[in-house]
Amino acid sequence: MLHNNTAVPPLLEVSGISKQFSGVMVLKHIDFTLFPGQIQALLGGNGAGKSTLMKIIAGLEQPDKGTLKISGHHVSHLNPTKAHQFGIYLIPQEPLLFPNLSVQENILFRLPKHQVDKSKMKQLLALLGCQLDLHVSAGSLNVADQQLVEIMRGLMRNSKILILDEPTASLTPVETERLFAQLRELQQQGVGIIFISHKIPEIYQLADQVSVMRDGTIALSGKIRDYTTDDIIQAITPAAKDQPLNGTPKLGLDLSNNQHQTVPDRPILTVTKLSGEGFSNISFSVKPGEILGLAGVVGAGRTELAETLYGLRPAVSGEIKLKQHTVNGLKTAQRLAQGLVYLPEDRQSSGLFLDSSLGWNICSLTHNRNTFWIRPAYDTAVLERYCQILNIKFSHINQPIKTLSGGNQQKILIAKCLEAHPAVLIIDEPTRGVDVAARNDIYQLIRHIAQQQVAIIFISSDLDEVVRIADRVLVMHQGEINGELTKQQMDVDTIMHIAFGEHKPQQAASC
């Protein structure tokens, strides 16, 4: 690590950076410094300005005021090509790979010919302690390996500054530790790393410096060892401390007029010996008002199962019953009309229409069902109702959803699912890329929805939140249910053991 040497000049100096969009100041006189061999965690609430600051550093946005110095050189009119030339590489939360190209082709894509060095690529893989098959398609990799490919793309371009945006959002603890080991190795080589995260415990494992943004300013900055968790949470937002889930939150959300009639003590969804791509022989049931957790490592088959239940993938065998009626032969739209609603893991590519307005997105599942015509006034009324209920922050009603922060995008996606009046709501990674305060909003909302007799299947890689939210949990391993735990039985360690197939406990009583 080089950053302890005060004689070493900074890799990056940001001075007085300001930026506004549509008259709204999103960055206000930001100062930020990164040294060689330093891992600096960057935290902040949704809309705090983290993404805008990183886009400016990566050349994707231009500042209105302020200066950037890279390795001591003043830089103006930075664009992505120049940023790469200066050794800056941004690794997005969702890896941007070509799924049909090989790993090697993705790593070398658009690399200048004089930098195409396959022996160097293999040396870097060895340095990171990885054994990637360079000839398989990138689309066949799990998220952890896709992120490694993105890191390799940066290193092959001689990057000295790596920006990682929520890299552990969909990783298991084991995959997270493997990534951390790789980042520590890069740190030893003098690479400066900006590590954006909403998971406070993990920054204490990895970072040596921390900066917290709030309302477009730096609210806290310094050595990580000088701050407690409470200090960081307070800097993110004074009201962001975890709230207990006891009692009924007064959110103003009323699903009592839900068109789907349910019987509280009778399972509303029953799955029997279901097999499909990525999973086999799955059987379970869920009752109205129950939150059923679905845990497992990446590749265990959770998302594949959810997409099959919703009709996005075909079932090979087995039966799905919704309200005592088999739905195997029904299309997705028909299952939706019967009250089966799915909130996908990837909100940007699968859940939202990024160039469309907020209200249009919320009502998009019901437009075709209710009327051929799109009704702007109706969409606006629905938007205003959900924005008040879910505390969604936006500038104007016609604002494209792609301009919102990740947490507000996720709340819009939840509102879209609720507007479809679910009887069964399948939620896949609902807090991915969401800050502490927004997570608590979502936890409270999920509990409130369940209290109104909606059955919820809750998929998450964050085992702490599975334990916190779920009434019961099914743990998948290699495409099968390897264990079932009641609320009293579940804890993170037990779930982890089952998820890795180490033991299969006695099954909890089926509900």
Swiss-Prot record:
Subcellular location, record wording: Cell inner membrane
Chief subcellular location equals: membrane
Quick check: keyword Repeat in the entry?
yes
Asked if the record carries the keyword NAD, the reply is no
Q: How does it sit in the membrane?
A: Peripheral membrane protein
Q: Pfam families in the record, alphabetically?
A: ABC_tran
Q: EC?
A: 7.6.2.13
Identify the residues that the record assigns to the ABC transporter domain, covering every copy: 12-240, 263-503
Positions that bind ATP:
44-51
Task: Provide the catalytic activity annotation.
Answer: ATP + H2O + (2R,4S)-2-methyl-2,3,3,4-tetrahydroxytetrahydrofuran-[AI-2-binding protein]Side 1 = ADP + phosphate + (2R,4S)-2-methyl-2,3,3,4-tetrahydroxytetrahydrofuranSide 2 + [AI-2-binding protein]Side 1
Keyword terms = ATP-binding, Cell inner membrane, Cell membrane, Membrane, Nucleotide-binding, Repeat, Translocase, Transport
> GO cellular component annotations, sorted alphabetically?
plasma membrane
From the Swiss-Prot or TrEMBL record, what is one GO molecular function term?
Answer: ATP binding
Checking SMART domains in the record gives: AAA (SM00382)
Q: Which PANTHER family match?
A: AUTOINDUCER 2 IMPORT ATP-BINDING PROTEIN LSRA (PTHR43790:SF2), CARBOHYDRATE TRANSPORT ATP-BINDING PROTEIN MG119-RELATED (PTHR43790)
As for family, the record states:
Belongs to the ABC transporter superfamily. AI-2 autoinducer porter (TC 3.A.1.2.8) family.
Q: Mind telling me which NCBIfam families this protein's record contains?
A: PRK15439.1
Instruction: Specify the protein name.
Output: Autoinducer 2 import ATP-binding protein LsrA
Gene symbol here is lsrA
